[in-house]
Swiss-Prot record:
This is Transmembrane protein 179B. The lineage of its organism: Eukaryota, Metazoa, Chordata, Craniata, Vertebrata. GO terms for cellular component: membrane. It comes from Danio rerio. It is found in: Membrane. Keywords: Membrane, Transmembrane, Transmembrane helix. Belongs to the TMEM179 family. PANTHER family: TRANSMEMBRANE PROTEIN 179B.
Length: 219
C-alpha cells in the first residue's frame, strides 16, 4: 500500500535523523577514545616540552550524556520507521489517530529540547578546548592545526577537531529535521480534524450521502 506523501516525507526525515544520531554518538565516542577515555569538552591543555598534554577535562558523564541523547533519538527514529513500514506492507491500513499524533508532537518537543542542549554543549565545549589550544600552543592560528602537532602518548589527537565538528554539525542538522517533522505532524493533525465523525465530507459524491432507502414523496 502506498504511503501518503506527508507520511512518506516524515519517514525519510526519521531515517535522516537516525543517521545524524549515529554520526554524533560515534564521533563523540571515538574522540573520547583518542584522548585515552577522557572527555575533552570544556577541557584545557598545557605544553610539556614540545608536546601537548591534557591539563584538565570534563566529567565523563558529559560525553555520555551527548552520546546517550543521540542514541535514544536514533533508536526512536529507527523503531518508528520500521513500524510504519510494517503497517504499510503487512497490515495494509494507514490510519493515524489524533491521540498518537499528539504523543508524537510531545516526544518531538522533548527531543528538540535535548538536541538543543546537546548542540550547545558540543559548541561551547569545543570552543573552550580550542581557546586553550590557541593560547597555549604557538605557531597555530586555527584549532584544527593542533591535529598535526605532537601530543603526549597515548593520546592520538590527529582527528579530534574533525570528529567534534562532525558531531556538532550532525546535532544541528538533526534539530532542523525534527522541526520539519513537527510541522508535518501538525499539518496531518489539522487535516485529520477537518472531517469529524457525524459531519459530511464535502468531497464525497451525492450517492454516498443519500439515505439507503429513498424518502417517500410529499403528498
Amino acid at each position: 500500500m502506498a504511503l501518503p506523501r506527508p507520511l512518506l516525507l516524515e519517514l525519510l526525515l526519521y531515517g535522516s535523523c537516525f543517521i545524524c544520531g549515529i554520526i554524533t554518538a560515534a564521533s563523540v565516542t571515538i574522540s573520547q577514545g583518542s584522548f585515552d577515555g577522557k572527555c575533552m569538552l570544556y577541557g584545557s591543555v598545557r605544553l610539556n616540552s614540545s608536546t601537548i598534554d591534557v591539563l584538565s577535562f570534563s566529567s565523563l558523564s558529559l560525553c555520555y550524556f551527548v552520546s546517550a541523547i543521540s542514541v535514544c533519538v536514533a533508536v526512536f527514529c529507527f523503531s518508528l520507521t520500521l513500524y510504519w513500514i510494517y503497517i504499510a506492507f503487512v497490515d495494509g491500513e494507514i490510519k493515524r489517530e489524533k491521540l498518537w499524533m499528539n504523543v508524537t508532537l510531545g516526544l518531538s518537543g522533548v527531543f528538540l529540547f535535548f538536541l538543543l542542549v546537546t548542540g550547545c554543549i558540543l559548541k561551547i565545549g569545543r570552543d573552550r578546548l580550542c581557546d586553550s589550544l590557541l593560547h597555549t600552543v604557538s605557531n597555530i592560528t586555527r584549532c584544527e592545526e593542533a591535529q598535526n602537532k605532537s601530543w603526549r602518548s597515548p593520546i592520538n589527537a590527529s582527528q579530534f577537531y574533525t570528529r567534534l565538528h562532525s558531531a556538532e554539525t550532525a546535532v544541528w542538522v538533526n534539530f532542523f529535521f525534527w522541526m520539519i517533522i513537527v510541522v508535518l505532524v501538525l499539518i496531518q493533525r489539522h487535516k485529520g480534524s477537518e472531517i469529524r465523525p457525524g459531519t459530511e465530507d464535502p468531497s464525497a459524491p451525492p450517492s454516498e450521502t443519500e439515505p439507503f432507502f429513498n424518502r417517500p414523496g410529499r403528498p
